From Swiss-Prot:
HAMAP family: Ribosomal_uL15
A Pfam entry, by short name: Ribosomal_L27A
Record keywords: Ribonucleoprotein, Ribosomal protein, RNA-binding, rRNA-binding
Complex formation: Part of the 50S ribosomal subunit.
GO MF entries: rRNA binding; structural constituent of ribosome
Name of this chain's protein: Large ribosomal subunit protein uL15
Family: Belongs to the universal ribosomal protein uL15 family.
A biological process from GO: translation
Function statement: Binds to the 23S rRNA.
Length: 144
């Protein structure tokens, strides 16, 4: 006996239903589609979300929100993340090289969150009042 000689025992597997192929199948004549109406016809589907002429839910609810285009080229970083930048001078390009901000970012602001690990010099980067105090307390400076 080979693998290709193996067969299931008779009656072990149920035959596939073939709608519309005689009354003996249990799905003859209408083939399980019922009588008349849109869904009994071929191609008789209704669009997802269609509620029979009633105003659909997605049109009853109001629109809301928008995506600010300013958010696409601006970013915020924490004071604790400044330690991840190589060297003592932190510029926009240095932040991009350290993967702290995306490549498309054009403006960055440093927020006070965590401690500044070492003295760093910020060039061309905006800072909050608290972050400025923390950076200067650590011996760093901010240049515009």
């Amino acid at each position: 006996m080979q693998l290709n000689d193996l067969r299931s025992a008779p009656g072990a597997r149920r035959e596939k239903l073939r709608p519309g192929r005689g009354i003996g199948s249990g799905l003859g004549k209408t083939g399980g589609r019922g009588h008349k109406g849109q869904t009994s016809r071929s191609g008789g589907k209704i669009a997802p979300g269609f509620e029979g002429g009633q105003q659909p839910l997605h049109r009853r609810l109001p629109k809301f929100g928008f995506t600010s285009l300013k958010a696409l080229d601006r970013a915020e970083i924490r004071t604790s993340e400044l330690a991840k930048v190589e060297g003592d001078v932190v510029t926009l390009q240095a932040l991009k090289d350290a993967n702290l901000v995306n490549q498309g970012v054009r403006r960055v602001k440093v927020m006070l969150s965590g401690d500044v690990g070492r003295a760093v010099t910020l060039k061309g980067i905006a800072v909050t009042k608290g972050a400025r105090a923390a950076i200067e307390a650590a011996g760093g400076k901010i240049e515009d």
